[in-house]
Each structure stands twice: as C-alpha cells, then as structure tokens.
Swiss-Prot record:
Belongs to the allatostatin family. It is found in: Secreted. The keyword Secreted applies. The modification Leucine amide is found at L8. This is Cydiastatin-6. The keyword Zinc does not apply. Disulfide bonds: none annotated. One of its GO terms (biological process) is neuropeptide signaling pathway. One of its GO terms (cellular component) is extracellular region. Keywords: Amidation, Neuropeptide, Secreted. It comes from Cydia pomonella.
Amino acid sequence: LPLYNFGL
C-alpha cells in the first residue's frame, strides 16, 4: 500500500 496514492 503506497502512501502517495492521491488518486493513482
């Protein structure tokens, strides 16, 4: 689970 998944 990526921390920087702002809508990716």
